[in-house]
């Protein structure tokens, strides 16, 4: 069996680079360019949630929803990596 606790992983601000972020966005359900930019500024560039939302004209509530979706995508990828070990 695979470790189910991977579903509780959470993205941490400044702990990913642009390529990692882009790959997660590619397989996530998030499509809004403004939200993607706000998420990138928050997770990769280190802006606060408030700053990222203001700079990209995104509501904080929708930003948080998108962050939750991206966290879910990240947790699924974390669980899947178990099946791709050599």
How should each PLM-predicted stretch be described?
Residues 51-59:
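Short alpha-helical "recognition helix" segments of helix-turn-helix
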Residues 66-67, 74:
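DNA major-groove recognition helix of helix-turn-helix
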Residues 73-86:
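Short Lys/Arg-enriched helix C-cap and helix-to-coil transition segments
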